[in-house]
Amino acid sequence: MPIIRVEMFTGRSPEQKKNIARELVDGFIRGAGGGSPQSFNVVFVDVDKQDWAHGYDMMNEKYPDT
């Protein structure tokens, strides 16, 4: 049973997450040549920008308004 872990900035709605999960699972199924959506788990991890750095840049400083 594959697990897809998605780490992203906080702020997506449940509906947006549902759409993301659907696209990811459908993409894996297409790429693998089949399978059942029910065999996948998608785990969303919401991360505050203040807790995410890319190199030396803190994301809350780099993207303060998004």
Per-region residue spans from a language model:
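A domain-level signal for the structural core that forms small-molecule/cofactor-binding pockets
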Residues: 1-66
